[in-house]
Design a protein with these regions (language model features):
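Fungal secretory targeting signals
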Residues: 1-16
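Acidic/His- and Gly-rich active-site-bordering loop/insert found
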Residues: 18-131, 140-160
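Conserved short loop/turn motifs at secondary-structure junctions
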Residues: 56-57, 165-169, 317-322
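Short, conserved micro-motifs enriched in small and acidic residues
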Residues: 131-140, 228-236
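Acidic/histidine-rich catalytic neighborhood of metal-dependent amide-processing enzymes
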Residues: 137-207
């Protein structure tokens, strides 16, 4: 699996920090790590399948996180569970001193994407969540890499600290952002990540910056047939906002992405909806563009508020910059 590349580089960093004979020491420690992964093949496949079947959405990955934590504890890692005020986030540590190497694990599923392990569309459970982005394998691969590097540290008496970060809610870009703000990554020397794909390669690209926000409009309920003039429709405000954003699209750069879903649109058609919420993702290659577009979206929302005489509130869930690629580290990955 591609996580073998990840563990090779982790081993390289540890070996380089602990030996003057870097190349020979690294190759030996690398072979130990690879052998450990191969020996654990059945165990790791079972973990992957279990997390696939759990299929828990962001911030609700209780069984998935518990399984990973139990495997880490069984193998001598010290684990802090529920870090950064997120019950399904954790930090597992092994070793001591420098360098401090981090490995990122994800394990959240996507709502409505339940799927059996086959190429045709066939849900395990209709309407349930599923691992459409392969995070069952991502978390398992990170676990396998951490255990393999730990085996190498033990056998070759390598110095350094290895950390596996359990980062929940990747699909909504929450876990890592909140952990970063909480200082969980402050003392790292290097942090490694991987993602399941259709091919094995070193990805040297970037990812889009993003702001995730919920726009809630509060109106006035009324009977839609008997006295609609007494009501103020929050759903009208949401719809007008969405229309405005859809016309906005023509005037954005090609890399911009504007996604939304109405999470609350009222309770019954014969009642003027007193509350409605729409959830937006605003993305672009550069964070400065995301900030510009988000202000534009917010201006449109405020216009909808005025047109419908409702009251707008905005909740920003997360705000994330684009990925800054580490070219020397990518070259080290490719070489190993």
């Amino acid at each position: 699996m591609r996580s073998l590349i990840l563990l090779s580089v982790a081993g390289a960093v540890v070996a380089a920090a602990s030996s003057g004979e870097c190349d020979e020491h690294f190759r030996s420690s690398q072979q130990t790590a690879i052998a450990d992964v191969e020996a654990r093949s059945d165990e790791l496949k079972a973990v992957n399948q279990a997390i696939w079947n759990f299929a828990e959405v962001g911030l609700e990955e209780h069984q998935s996180a518990s399984l990973l934590v139990s495997k880490l504890k069984q193998n001598g890692f010290e684990v802090e569970h529920g870090v950064s005020d997120m019950p399904t986030a954790f930090v597992a540590s092994y070793g001591s001193g420098k360098p401090i190497i981090g490995i990122l694990a994800e394990y959240d599923a996507l709502p409505g994407m339940s799927q059996k392990v086959q190429p045709e569309r066939l849900p395990l459970q209709e309407g349930a969540a599923g691992h459409a982005c392969g995070h069952s394998g991502l978390g398992t691969g990170a676990l396998g890499a951490a255990l393999a590097v730990k085996a190498s540290i033990e056998k070759h008496n390598l110095k350094g600290t290895l950390r596996l970060y359990g980062t929940p809610a990747e699909e909504t870009v929450i876990g890592k952002v909140y952990m970063l703000l909480d200082g969980q990554f402050d003392d790292l020397d290097v942090c490694l990540h991987w993602h399941p794909s259709t091919r094995t390669n070193v990805w040297a690209g970037s990812s889009k910056a993003l702001i995730s926000a919920k726009f809630t409009f509060d109106g006035i309920s009324a009977h839609a047939a008997g006295s609609p003039e007494n009501g103020r429709s929050a759903l009208d405000a949401v719809e007008l906002m969405n229309v405005g954003v859809n016309f906005m699209r023509e005037h954005t750069k090609e890399d911009a992405r504007l996604h939304y879903v109405i999470t609350n649109g009222g309770g019954a058609p014969n009642v003027v909806p007193p509350k409605a919420t729409v959830w937006y993702f605003v993305r672009a290659d550069k964070h400065e563009d995301v900030e510009y577009y988000f202000k534009w979206v917010r201006d449109i929302a405020e216009g909808a508020e005025k047109m419908t005489r409702t009251k707008l509130s905005v909740q920003i869930d997360t705000d994330c910059h684009e990925l800054i690629q580490n070219t020397p580290l990518s070259e080290l990955l490719f070489a190993n």
